[in-house]
């Protein structure tokens, strides 16, 4: 799976070197990215991070658009220095001129949100469900108390959880 992406990174660098008639230092490529971002270019570390889940689910477009997008950031940084805008003229020049791609800033991949467990707390008031995050539930277990704003009684864990 990663070989294709690494190969595409190399191809993008070869295209940039042919276009600009100079060499570029190759980055470290990592697949340690989660969440909504498809890729991130760390300019000062010369590092590219890619989201393996989004790559797996959108491989064709990822290789065609996302990889050149991130490589263009590193190439722009090596050519023009740190004083440029992330998606500014220099980056757009590379996207259009070198890779012949539209300089799109964001991907349109469907991103699955992770499910979240809520811990249900209650007070004596009718219809008083208070869904707590795991972090807040942990604070209660360590001794923190939360009060109902209406009756001023402490909220008590009901033993119920809900997945959202």
Swiss-Prot record:
A GO cellular component term found in this entry reads:
cytoplasm
Cofactor dependence: Zn(2+)
Co-factor remark: Binds 1 zinc ion.
InterPro entries from the UniProt entry: SprT-like_domain, Uncharacterised_SprT
Classify the source by domain of life: Bacteria
Q: Where is the SprT-like domain?
A: 17-155
The entry's active site is 70
Record's keyword terms, sorted: Cytoplasm, Metal-binding, Zinc
- NCBIfam families associated with the record: PRK04860.1
Q: What is this protein called?
A: Protein SprT
Organism, by scientific name, is Pseudomonas syringae pv. tomato (strain ATCC BAA-871 / DC3000)
> Which gene is transcribed and translated to give this protein?
sprT
């Amino acid at each position: 799976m990663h070989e294709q992406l690494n190969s595409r990174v190399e191809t993008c660098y070869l295209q940039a070197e042919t276009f600009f008639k100079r060499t570029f230092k190759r980055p470290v490529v990592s697949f340690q990215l989660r969440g909504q971002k498809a890729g991130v270019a760390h300019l000062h570390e010369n590092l590219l991070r890619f989201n393996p889940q989004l790559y797996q689910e959108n491989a064709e477009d990822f290789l065609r658009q996302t990889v050149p997008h991130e490589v263009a950031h590193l190439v722009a940084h090596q050519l023009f220095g740190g004083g440029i805008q992330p998606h500014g003229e220099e980056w757009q020049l590379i996207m259009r001129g070198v890779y012949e791609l539209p300089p799109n800033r964001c991907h349109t991949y469907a991103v699955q949100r992770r499910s979240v467990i809520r811990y249900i707390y209650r007070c004596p008031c009718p219809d008083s469900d208070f869904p707590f995050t795991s972090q807040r539930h942990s604070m209660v277990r360590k001794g923190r108390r939360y009060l109902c704003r209406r009756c001023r009684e402490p909220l008590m864990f009901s033993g119920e959880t809900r997945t959202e």
